[in-house]
Amino acid sequence: MDPGGLKHSKDKGLAFGKLSESSVEGSFSGDTGGSKSTTSTSLMHLPGSRPQPPARDSANGLNVTTTQMELSTGGLTIEEAEVKVMEKAIRMQQPQKPQQNQQLFENFALLEASIADLNRSNTPGSSVLGRPHDLFSLKTENFSPMDKDRLDMGSVSFGQSQKDLDVNERLLGDNTMDILQDLDLPGSLSDLNEFYVSDEAAFLSSLSVEDVLLEDGNMETKPIDCSNGGNCTNVDSADQQKQLLEAGVSMPVIKTEEDADTSFIQLCTPGVIKQENDRRSFCQISSLDLPSTHNSAGSISGPSYPYGANTSTAVSLQQDQKPVFGLYPPLPSVSDSWNRGNGYATGSGMSSSSFPVGFSSPKARPEASGSASSAPAKPSGPTHKICLVCSDEASGCHYGVLTCGSCKVFFKRAVEGWRARQNTDGQHNYLCAGRNDCIIDKIRRKNCPACRFRKCLQAGMNLEARKNKKLIRLKGQQTTMEPNPPPPDERACALIPKSMPQLVPTMLSLLKAIEPEAIYSGYDSTIPDTSTRLMTTLNRLGGQQVVSAVKWAKSLPGFRNLHLDDQMTLLQCSWLFLMSFGLGWRSYQQCNGGMLCFAPDLVINDERMKLPYMTDQCEQMLKISTEFVRLQVSYDEYLCMKVLLLLSTVPKDGLKSQAVFDEIRMTYIKELGKAIVKREENSSQNWQRFYQLTKLLDSMQEMVGGLLQICFYTFVNKSLSVEFPEMLAEIISNQLPKFKDGSVKPLLFHALNHDTMP
């Protein structure tokens, strides 16, 4: 019994506590995440040492008094003090009224004074842990200014009020002793290496807690919410989780453990990350799985374990306590920094091999591994085949091309309807309203049948492919029925018939696809015919045919590769050639060259040819149809010759893209030769046929020249009162000066001048 009437326990020793300036400042500011840089100073009471009053902190409003010395004579034993601590801790969890805060502060200060007085009377040779205090050296750390959000586990923050100022004065009483004031500690984290000693493992192991202590009955106090102006209320797990997520900080868990022989208070602080500059690696000492901020410096407190160690001495969670780390999302920055380092350092300073993935704690390993590992790839289903026409999902190979069912039916109806309308190969009734470049997809494939049919032909669809497929299937069945099958190479050759046509669309098939339909004139045959009315109707029909010819020319393969000025020049010079050649073909097909079939509803017979200004024109046009009858021109030959007429008149100065023009013209000359070979089985007559057809093309220059003179005369002579459509009038106005000054020239096949030969 000391003079103050204070009893000592039989286990006398030293007690450690941590007091942080950041926590003291937090008690006045009420903000744990402030921007001030704080440096924590460890306070230690050693037996036998004299108490030293701490420095007066006038900046924080602290006046050191002798309150704790006066309270040390209360006659309390350490067991009674701990019972009071437990009672106060339990009482702190219950809702308190603002007027009870003063009593709570006084009880807390009374405990501090009792422990301080007990430390003065302890003998130097005993400790709570059963070891002399001189077995390990003192190690302190100066936290870097980056640690702004760390909570100090040895203090409780309260709101800012005048009562708090008085209570905090007693917290730093005269009996509080700071032995670190005598030490001249460095101010940077890198200078602390000299304080680390070789027996650091002994220091860390001395702070370990045995499993027996953890298996006893533990009592916990929940974190206290003191953010409402100094009113401290306990919160349940749901409110605690909400406050933790809103505040973005980690709350400490204060655990009270009691043993039969030894009674002490253990403050388990959360594990944080200690950053070392060696090889950019990181050391993690974990006691509780509480997350820390990205910029927090390392500190060591409580039991220490090597990184990734799954030990049984970790702090056990009670049934009513939820894991604290479950309230926080995993921190990817910790794992990223571990992955960047070459390795890690354990708590004892031993270097271990590096791991590819780092975890904040063993308890969080399943979650971290689940989040770090990439999700298993979903088994990809069967790849969908795309229709080559409309890009829809293909249903199979139809007519030699991978297409959908809609395009299959469309192509079949288009080709069969085309053949049903004409006994021989003819033209379909599809006409593009645009520029023959419409987009054909799943949504817009029904907007333009002409472009859709052209795309089917470009993809290589062919009705003969279905027959060839059946032939291949029959051949395959016959080869399987043979007793001795031939070698694989011979069998593969036998499956392919020799007469199998090409699935790639030919130039002739494209020319058939883009050929314009016949245009009706709308002429009223019930009214008596006059030259003016008849010529006006023919001019109006010619204007419509010119528009159709422009669309047809733009759809020609290779024509749009020419310069735009060259395209306009060729159309202006050859529009009447195209109209006359088409008129001769229709007259040959429908009237066998006896009459002029301008349109299905307008046929010029002998009576109409006798009208004024009609005889000369009709005689020139009948010559063309007569040549068709004499030569029995096929449809394929007609299509190729029509393209060559478009390319038969050019300016004398040449075109801007002359090389491209020459290549295109030579291509269609070869196509004409292919059409001749397709028609004539006798190869000896092919060259003769080619000569006859090219002579017909040259004769078109003379026949159309006479028609142009009549057209120009009718256009200039206003007394005839012949109406010309706007587009046709514009073309004639541009073409007339060129023909008068002779700035254009024809391209002939059989001219005497070899310079004009192709």
Curated annotation (Swiss-Prot):
Output one GO BP term.
Answer: response to copper ion
Q: What InterPro entries does the record tag this protein with?
A: Glcrtcd_rcpt, NHR-like_dom_sf, Nucl_hrmn_rcpt_lig-bd, Nuclear_hormone_rcpt_NR3, Nuclear_hrmn_rcpt, Znf_hrmn_rcpt, Znf_NHR/GATA
Which intervals of the chain are annotated as region Modulating? 1-386
- Pfam families cross-referenced by the UniProt entry: GCR, Hormone_recep, zf-C4
Query: What SMART domains would the database entry show?
Result: HOLI, ZnF_C4
Show the ranges annotated as biased composition (Low complexity): 26-42
Q: Name one GO molecular function term.
A: nuclear cortisol receptor activity
Q: What is its main location?
A: cytoplasm
> Among the entry's GO cellular component annotations, what is one?
nuclear speck
- For the region Hinge, give the residue spans: 462-498
Q: In which tissues is it expressed?
A: Isoform 1 is expressed in all tissues tested including liver, gills, intestine, skeletal muscle, kidney, heart, spleen, stomach, brain, pituitary, ovary, testis, skin and bladder. Isoform 2 is found only in testis.
Which stretches of the protein fold into NR C4-type zinc fingers, per the record?
387-407, 432-456
Keyword entries, A-Z: Chromatin regulator, Cytoplasm, Cytoskeleton, DNA-binding, Lipid-binding, Metal-binding, Mitochondrion, Nucleus, Receptor, Steroid-binding, Transcription, Transcription regulation, Zinc, Zinc-finger
Q: Where is this region: Disordered?
A: 1-61, 349-382
Mind listing where the DNA-binding region sits, in residue ranges? Answer: 387-461
Specify the domain of life of the species encoding this protein.
Answer: Eukaryota
What compartments host this protein? Cytoplasm; Nucleus; Mitochondrion; Cytoplasm, Cytoskeleton, Spindle
Record text about domains: Composed of three domains: a modulating N-terminal domain, a DNA-binding domain and a C-terminal ligand-binding domain. The ligand-binding domain is required for correct chromosome segregation during mitosis although ligand binding is not required.
Please give the subunit comment from the record.
Heteromultimeric cytoplasmic complex with HSP90AA1, HSPA1A/HSPA1B, and FKBP5 or another immunophilin such as PPID, STIP1, or the immunophilin homolog PPP5C. Upon ligand binding FKBP5 dissociates from the complex and FKBP4 takes its place, thereby linking the complex to dynein and mediating transport to the nucleus, where the complex dissociates. Directly interacts with UNC45A. Binds to DNA as a homodimer, and as heterodimer with NR3C2 or the retinoid X receptor. Binds STAT5A and STAT5B homodimers and heterodimers. Interacts with NRIP1, POU2F1, POU2F2 and TRIM28.
Q: What is the documented function of this protein?
A: Receptor for glucocorticoids (GC). Has a dual mode of action: as a transcription factor that binds to glucocorticoid response elements (GRE), both for nuclear and mitochondrial DNA, and as a modulator of other transcription factors. Affects inflammatory responses, cellular proliferation and differentiation in target tissues. Involved in chromatin remodeling. Plays a role in rapid mRNA degradation by binding to the 5' UTR of target mRNAs and interacting with PNRC2 in a ligand-dependent manner which recruits the RNA helicase UPF1 and the mRNA-decapping enzyme DCP1A, leading to RNA decay.
PANTHER family per UniProt: KNIRPS-RELATED PROTEIN-RELATED
Protein name, as recorded: Glucocorticoid receptor
The organism is Oncorhynchus mykiss (Rainbow trout)
